[in-house]
Curated annotation (Swiss-Prot):
SUPFAM superfamilies: Ribosomal protein L10-like
Signal peptide boundaries: none
InterPro entries hit by this protein: Ribosomal_uL10 (IPR001790), Ribosomal_uL10-like_sf (IPR043141), Ribosomal_uL10_bac (IPR022973), Ribosomal_uL10_bac_type (IPR047865), Ribosomal_uL10_CS_bac (IPR002363)
Keyword annotations: Ribonucleoprotein, Ribosomal protein, RNA-binding, rRNA-binding
Stated name of the protein: Large ribosomal subunit protein uL10
Gene: rplJ
GO biological process, one term: translation
Pfam families: Ribosomal_L10 (PF00466)
Function: Forms part of the ribosomal stalk, playing a central role in the interaction of the ribosome with GTP-bound translation factors.
Species lineage: Bacteria, Pseudomonadati, Pseudomonadota, Alphaproteobacteria, Rhodobacterales
Subunit field text: Part of the ribosomal stalk of the 50S ribosomal subunit. The N-terminus interacts with L11 and the large rRNA to form the base of the stalk. The C-terminus forms an elongated spine to which L12 dimers bind in a sequential fashion forming a multimeric L10(L12)X complex.
Length: 172
């Protein structure tokens, strides 16, 4: 790889570190090509990506970035799993690590916050952006449906009482 290619890789990695909601660093030694393809497919489905890069170039790309503290994790055969959604990459990495013991999560970064192994696990258990939006919408919609039910209830109660009175009158 010549100098121009290295500079391009550093620039691409820098953009990844700046634009990603979360970046997870893991060791992947011993994984087969099929297992790596499975990891990439899972990440793609979740809206994320997987990148294997030279640690030295990744460390250069981290210089001056908010997540620069993550540079200490870049040793050995490392892979970066990242996504704009702050939860997606962590969920993909955790799920893949449970299925593949050779995939060892080291930590990562979420914005300016460095994450250790437990931090990545905690982030993976959080609801995704879409799930949070759905929860908020249901919370906003619940009072309106309760009010509509309360307004409609007296009318249905009156109708029920009237039908009972009519039935009793007809029976007598």
């Amino acid at each position: 790889m010549d100098r121009a290619q290295k500079e391009k890789v550093v620039e691409e990695l820098g953009q990844i570190f700046e634009s990603s909601g979360v970046v997870v660093v893991a060791h992947y030694a011993g994984l087969t090509v099929a297992e790596m393809q499975d990891l990439r497919a899972r990440a793609r489905e979740a809206g994320g990506s997987v990148r294997v890069a030279k640690n030295r170039l990744a460390k250069i790309a981290l210089e001056g970035k908010p997540c620069a503290s993550m540079a200490d994790l870049l040793t050995g055969m490392t892979v970066l799993t990242y996504s704009e959604d702050p939860v997606a990459a962590a969920k993909v990495a955790e799920g893949f690590a449970k299925d593949n013991k050779k995939f060892e999560i080291l930590g990562g970064a979420m914005g300016e916050n460095a994450l250790d192994r437990a931090g990545v696990e905690a982030v993976s258990k959080m609801p995704s952006r879409e799930e949070l939006i759905a929860q908020i919408v249901s919370c906003i919609g619940a009072p309106a449906s309760n009010i509509a039910g309360a307004i409609g209830a007296p009318a249905s109660n009156i109708a029920g009482i009237l039908s009972t009175i009519i039935e009793k009158a007809e029976a007598a």
